[in-house]
Amino acid sequence: MTAQIPYQHSSGYISHFHNNELDAGRGRDYNVTIKYLDDKEENIEGQAAKISHNASLHIPVLLCLVISLGGFIFGWDIGTIGGMTNMVSFQEKFGTTNIIHDDETIFVSTKKLTDLQIGLIISIFNISCGVGALTLSKIGDWIGRKGGIWFALVVYCIGITIQILSYGRWYFLTLGRAVTGIGVGVTTVLVPMFLSENSPLKIRGSMVSTYQLIVTFGILMGNILNFICERCYKDPTQNIAWQLPLFLGYIWAIIIGMSLVYVPESPQYLAKIKNDVPSAKYSFARMNGIPATDSMVIEFIDDLLENNYNNEETNNESKKQSLVKRNTFEFIMGKPKLWLRLIIGMMIMAFQQLSGINYFFYYGTSVFKGVGIKDPYITSIILSSVNFLSTILGIYYVEKWGHKTCLLYGSTNLLFYMMTYATVGTFGRETDFSNIVLIIVTCCFIFWFAITLGPVTFVLVSELFPLRTRAISMAICTFINWMFNFLISLLTPMIVSKIDFKLGYIFAACLLALIIFSWILVPETRKKNEQEINKIFEPE
């Protein structure tokens, strides 16, 4: 049995490592208990500065992109379902028979889905995503971030199978989409969380933003495939037109699942939940492009475990029981002001949807028709292309501007373009010039959303919470995002039919509220560790 020797951290904290661990930078036997610990994450500013400038981030960036691929299936569903439900073969397969009587008293039989059926098929996905995010994302604490994503991919494939085997029964198709949504909902929590915990310290914000980039890429690819299928398979009996997007879902899930094999597990999960410190050291070193023997690795582990070491002396049975009771609702009752952090996270997620972005993707088709672009498939490709290309810039600006600044700057620009859109649409005459203005404003709105609110929302929310409550807190925030997504997609057509472009003023009011809310309550989390964020909520 190897002897234990203390290692003196620069802050005065002593961690107990084995002598062979200090020599080799790795080991298997640690005398560390990691139960009921409080989180003390890395000091991003200080530690990132200490990492060698020679550290190569090519492999870490590639591995982060692999993690972010988990968002592709989310975008793929968004990009394919709208076009699928409009395909003639889809309507013939799942619709009910309608008898049409023309002027010459000839009866024509067609099959068509009702608006209610289409609404249920599309919106059930949003509801089930919210349910999956809220109820099953905790699995990431039980079997790891990677294991949780693999579980979600299996659920996703089961949902695809149900849809393919629905045999023309729209309610079975809806059930399949519900199961698929549960799987996707889990990924919307675990993928940003995994990215936040595994990204190189120097570029964490940018790497978390790649999740939104991959989502928009999935939307674009789905739109392009729909366009190809609609052009190539016009015969109502050619079910391959709507089945191909579903079959490809298997391929994406397999690619994502196999790629994750090469990604190390989250160092926070390994060290603080699984109690596997050697693997945590390896993970941190690999994802920051430094050797496992680098002093930064030891310092990072020390920072993760410091609070646990300080709490070991009070680790008796009665206090264990009190901690268990406390931890049940710690995400609300914990300090410092975790309830306020949860409210901030929920509001940011809600405001992302209330910005009106999905209104543009829904109503943009009508605007493009005004200048002769009447094909909804082409319109979708144009809008999703702007969204994807702009998100690439967002990866840079989220890190450059800072998270709160990005939120304020983005919402201010979105407010301007939403007001312009609503005013021109409401009071402008229907001319080619006004339609061109509306198209330009639409693209500008999507551009500013893609470089600010789109990526920064998940980055900021993922950094608000300590590790001990991050899973449940992010699950609740993501659930709110999905519920507002569902409500807006459900209510927008009805509201537009009543007040038309004036709906833009409602979204503008929400954006103004976001600016005020962000200015007063949202903290700047860029390059701040948990202790620094704690001081913001409880100033000493």
Curated annotation (Swiss-Prot):
Its main location: membrane. Probable glucose transporter. It is found in: Membrane. The keyword Transport applies. Residues 77-119, 168-177, 226-243, 375-380, 427-440, 500 are extracellular. Keywords: Membrane, Repeat, Sugar transport, Transmembrane, Transmembrane helix, Transport. It comes from the Eukaryota. Belongs to the major facilitator superfamily. Sugar transporter (TC 2.A.1.1) family. It is a multi-pass membrane protein. This is Hexose transporter HXT14. It comes from Saccharomyces cerevisiae (strain ATCC 204508 / S288c) (Baker's yeast). The lineage of its organism: Eukaryota, Fungi, Dikarya, Ascomycota, Saccharomycotina.
